[in-house]
Amino acid sequence: MAAPRLKGLHHIKLPVTDLETSLNWYGRVFDAEHLTRFDHYDGAGVRYAVILQLPGVDIPIELRWAPDAAAATVGYDPVHFVAGGADDLQAWVAHLDTLGIEHSPVITALAGQLLIFRDPDQTYLHLLTVPEGGVLAIEMNPDAAEPEGPWIMPDLMRHP
């Protein structure tokens, strides 16, 4: 019997150590809109999660105040955004430079070009180029991989 068909992805949840710092950072970097009606509060009235909508991204991002989880996943790279083409990556380089955010150079890797930077909790975020036809149209290029670079393969993500 086949599995029931999924209808999509609801949201992405990222653990953070400081909700306000991360909310402000994602707002500055991505022009993220804070969807306040979805704020999560505990029984004591403490806000512990916020939902953001990033321009150009259909899936909302949840930032959840979870310091232990954020500390345990330093160096993890759970989210890979589509930036567009090579010119779009250069626009992101300029944007991140203007904000003073450290980032990788534009890297040519297995699945195209990418730019990598970290959020305030040291979660690695990737911006990738994608060809016409989308992700499934990517032709892998194993000769172009740069697996030993500190940006492309943080220690946490190295295989045994």
Regions found by a protein language model. Name each.
Residues I61-R64, H126:
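Conserved beta-strand in the GNAT
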Residues M1-A2, R64-A69:
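Short beta-strand/turn micro-motifs at beta-sheet edges
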Residues P55, R64-A66, V130:
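Generic beta-structure capping elements
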